[in-house]
Amino acid sequence: MMTQGPNLIGIHTNTKENEETQKFVNWFLNTSLTWDNNESKTPAQYFTESASYILPLKETFTGSNNKGQSGKNDGKNSNNTFKAKALELFKEQSENKIVGYSDPSDFRGGKFRESIGSAFNATVNSHVDFNTFVANFRANLGSGYDK
């Protein structure tokens, strides 16, 4: 399974910036605010609903303390079939039933995703086997990925 989304990458710089990053994460996950529709929810809950995003927290999959998801839009109770399926796959990943892959935060990430799409489209349209799919994918990536 390919995973993708906003990432919070912690990079140690200095004590002051580390503390400010911790304050932001605490605010994002734990501070309840009133939003446009007069509902009270955390910024994480607002973000997940607005972006149809699944916040990868333990609570999302166990149902306890639901910091990142608010009930009506958590994927389980959503009319969004894609989000419900994604939640199911993430749950399987959290139980080590499947392996997730996330491309590294790198300037080449877009090229990598575009190459997967191109190779997949070529495979679907021409009914080629898996080995041909991989060969097409590698060809689309170019020599910069050959390591």
Curated annotation (Swiss-Prot):
Pfam families: Lipoprotein_10. It comes from the Bacteria. Belongs to the MG185/MG260 family. This is Uncharacterized lipoprotein MPN_098.
